[in-house]
From Swiss-Prot:
GO terms for biological process: cellular response to oxidative stress; DNA-templated transcription; transcription by RNA polymerase II. It comes from the Eukaryota. The keyword Cytoplasm applies. This is Coiled-coil domain-containing protein 124 homolog.
């Protein structure tokens, strides 16, 4: 019979070798997984790079195309755009050959002068001023009341109301103080009134 101690040592050595082999096998499997993961990530990164490069190339080509189209060329789109801009500028210069000079002596003049600069606006001719009077008065009171309380402190609210109502009768925001026409006035008549109003303001405010 062999030595029991030696048999135990051999068994222990065999067990240790088996554990080492299992560990090596497990490590090899882990290494393989990591290797595959790295390769997969690398492929995804390369695909993203290629996609970004294609997008940059497409954007660059689009910008180059737009730039080429905007350049003046014989019979090209760019020349048509430039010609259109030039014709618009010429028309504007022909319509306004000389810039008039105006002056405002008070707040009403300043508001009228502002209306000249916006002569294309249609709010200067009002067919239904009565519809807008109440809302305009309310808006005026909201902005005016805090100022009036500072200017004339100690009054009752109805006194402030009376003062603001009287002020609004002459205020330019009052729809009845703007140019009004009846609801059935023709468009040609409205345009003639607008031109007459503009000419009147220009004559009064011209320096």
């Amino acid at each position: 019979m062999g030595n029991p101690k030696k048999r135990a040592e051999k068994a222990e050595a065999a067990k240790s070798r088996k554990q080492d082999e299992e560990k090596k096998k497990k490590d090899a499997e882990e290494d393989e997984k990591w290797s595959k993961g790295v390769k997969t990530n690398k492929k995804e990164q390369e695909a993203e790079k290629r996609k970004a490069a294609l997008e940059r190339k497409a954007e660059r080509e689009r910008l180059e195309k737009e730039e080429m189209e905007s350049l003046p060329s014989k019979g090209g789109k760019g020349s048509k755009k430039a010609a259109k801009k030039n014709s618009s500028l010429d028309a504007f210069l022909n319509e306004t050959p000389q810039t008039a000079s105006y002056s405002a002596r008070n707040i009403d003049d300043a508001l009228d002068l502002l209306s000249l600069n916006n002569s294309s606006s249609k709010d200067k001719i009002d067919r239904h001023p009565e519809r807008r009077f109440k809302a305009a008065l309310t808006e005026y009171k909201q902005s005016r009341l805090p100022e009036l309380r500072k200017e004339q402190p100690g009054l009752r609210l109805n006194q402030y109301e009376d003062i603001m109502y009287k002020e609004f009768q002459k205020h330019p925001d009052n729809p009845f103080n703007k140019m009004n026409v009846s609801y059935n006035t023709s468009q040609d008549e409205v345009e003639q009134l607008r031109k007459a109003r503009k000419a009147e303001l220009e004559a009064r405010l011209r320096e």
